[in-house]
Regions:
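Phosphate/diphosphate ligand-binding glycine-rich loop within oxidoreductases
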Residues: 2-115
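Glycine-rich adenosine-cofactor-binding loop
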Residues: 8, 100-105, 112, 116-144, ...
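Alpha-helix N-cap/loop-to-helix initiation residues
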Residues: 12-13, 132, 154
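Adenosine-cofactor binding site in Rossmann-like domains, unifying the SAM/SAH pocket
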Residues: 152-158
Length: 158
């Protein structure tokens, strides 16, 4: 049985495990989704070693940036954003290869692109949290100037 999972800390708020396990069952996919609540990103190595069936991981707070140093490769988008939320795990012989991606930018950009008209030149991004980096990248890829709105005073925000 293939395994997939989520790494982060804490994970009590996450609905991923029940969501994906229900999808696997409904689609007849022989797979399991597991939450790996790890207090340190250094625990990732132990998870990989003790779960050789792992094919992929979702990554949530606080590890979207910290996980990058554990990866063998990172997609250009995730590299530019500086955050990874999907890790593809490949096994080649005794070697485990970890590839990082950012699906936030793909989902956001594809969902907003049909609504962007030629007269749209600027966009406000509300917040400066993790997803805002992906949103900023997506908006810029569509040719829009961006401004961040934050509740905290930071350079480059209003």
């Amino acid at each position: 049985m293939d395994k997939y999972g989520l790494i982060g800390y804490p994970l009590g708020h996450s609905f991923s495990k029940s969501y994906f396990n229900e999808k696997f069952e409904n689609e007849g996919i022989n797979a399991e989704y597991i939450n790996f609540e790890i207090p340190s990103i250094g625990d990732l190595t132990e998870i990989l070693d003790s779960n050789p069936e792992l094919k992929g991981l979702n990554v949530t707070i606080p590890y979207k940036e910290k996980v990058i140093s554990y990866l063998d490769s990172v997609s250009p988008e995730a590299n530019a954003i500086g955050a990874v939320n999907v890790v593809k795990i490949e096994h080649k012989g005794d070697e485990t290869i970890l590839k990082g991606y950012n699906s936030d930018v793909i989902g956001f950009t594809q969902s907003i692109e049909p609504f962007v008209e030629s007269y749209h030149k600027k966009a406000l991004i509300l917040g400066t949290g993790g997803a805002s980096k992906a949103i900023n990248y997506g908006l810029k890829s569509l040719g829009l100037e961006t401004v961040f709105v934050s509740r905290y005073e930071r350079p480059g925000t209003i």
